[in-house]
Amino acid sequence: MTIRAVVRGVGHYLPDRVVPNSELEAIVETTDEWIRTRSGIERRHFAAEGQTTSDLAARAARAALDDAGLQPDDIDTLIVATSTADLTFPSAATMVQAALGMTRGFAFDVQAVCAGFVYALANADALIRSGQAQRVLVIGAETFSRLMDWNDRATCVLFGDGAGAVVLEGTESAGTSADRGILATDLHSDGRFKDLLYVDGGSSTGTTGHLRMQGREVFRHAVEKLAETAHTALEKAGLGAGDVDWIVPHQANLRIISATAQRMQVPMDRVILTVQDHGNTSAASIPLALSVGKARGQIKEGDLLVTEAIGGGLAWGSVVLRW
C-alpha cells in the first residue's frame, strides 16, 4: 500500500471590496478595454484598511476545515504560501495558527511568490508521504495591492488580494494513477532571472517597496516553462495531457493561461478560469481557483488536475493530483 496526500477539504476568502477596471481609470492612465485586452481581468478584490494577509488566510482556512468536517486541532501542520506576510517575522503561518486556536503541530511559511502554493503543496505531500504529518492545512494568501506602484499602469491593474486553502490527509491506496491524491510534483527555480519580476524593498532598503516587472520577458518564460513543467509532472505520474480533466493554472493573465494551454494541446474548456474576477492574487490564485472550481460544479471527485505556476525568482513548478 502507498500513502497519498488526498484533498479532504477546500475553501477560500475574498475581501469585501471589489475594484472594477472602471475604478482604476480614475487612478492611473488606463481603460477598461486596455486592461481586459491585455490581461482578461475585469475586477479584483482589495483588502480593507487594517485587514492583513493572515486575516485572509485564517478565513480561507476555516472554510476549508468546514468543508473537510475537521477542527483546527485535527491538523498536524499548517503551511502558508505568501510573499506579503504581515511582518518580517514571525511567520504568517504561526499567526494563522493562533487565530484558529491551534494548540498542536507546527506551522511555517513558503515564499516562492506566484509559485508559492505549488511549492507548499509539494512540501505538504513530502511531509505526509514520509509520515511526519497526517493532515496538512495548505494556504495561499496575499495582499499584493499594498505592493503596487500606482504610477505604473503596466502592473498596478493586474493584482488583487485573497486567500484559498486545502486540507490534505494521508490516505492508504494501491498507489495507481486512478487513486485519489497527489500523484506527482515538479519544481524548478533559476535566480539568473531575478530582475524580471521583483519587489524593490526589504530589509536591505528599509522600505516595503513596489513590484517591478518586465512583462514581455515574463510572458515568454512563463509559456515555455509552465507547459514544460506540466508535461514533466504528468510523465512522472505515467500520464499525458489527454488524461487531464482540468488545468488549474496560476491566474496571472489570460494570455499566458491560453498560450500555455495551447502549447499543452489542452482546450480552454478544460481550464479553470478565475482571473477575470480576482486578477493576479499570486500564491492565492491556485487554491482560489480550486475552491471556486469546486463550487461551480466543474471539479468533481476523481477528476485529474494539473496545477502550474511561475513567479519571481524565477521559480516555477506543477502538481498533478486526482481530486
Swiss-Prot record:
GO terms for molecular function: 3-oxoacyl-[acyl-carrier-protein] synthase activity; beta-ketoacyl-acyl-carrier-protein synthase III activity. InterPro entries: ACP_syn_III_C (IPR013747), ACP_syn_III_N (IPR013751), FabH (IPR004655), Thiolase-like (IPR016039). Pfam families: ACP_syn_III, ACP_syn_III_C. Keywords: Acyltransferase, Cytoplasm, Fatty acid biosynthesis, Fatty acid metabolism, Lipid biosynthesis, Lipid metabolism, Multifunctional enzyme, Transferase. It catalyses: malonyl-[ACP] + acetyl-CoA + H(+) = 3-oxobutanoyl-[ACP] + CO2 + CoA. Pathway: Lipid metabolism; fatty acid biosynthesis. It is found in: Cytoplasm. The active site is at C114, H250, N280. One of its GO terms (biological process) is secondary metabolite biosynthetic process. Its EC number is 2.3.1.180. Its main location: cytoplasm. Residues 251-255 are annotated as: ACP-binding. Gene3D superfamilies: 3.40.47.10. It is an enzyme of class 2 (transferase). One of its GO terms (cellular component) is cytoplasm. Belongs to the thiolase-like superfamily. FabH family. Catalyzes the condensation reaction of fatty acid synthesis by the addition to an acyl acceptor of two carbons from malonyl-ACP. Catalyzes the first condensation reaction which initiates fatty acid synthesis and may therefore play a role in governing the total rate of fatty acid production. Possesses both acetoacetyl-ACP synthase and acetyl transacylase activities. Its substrate specificity determines the biosynthesis of branched-chain and/or straight-chain of fatty acids. The last Arg residue of the ACP-binding site is essential for the weak association between ACP/AcpP and FabH. Homodimer. This is Beta-ketoacyl-[acyl-carrier-protein] synthase III. The lineage of its organism: Bacteria, Pseudomonadati, Pseudomonadota, Alphaproteobacteria, Rhodobacterales. The gene is fabH.
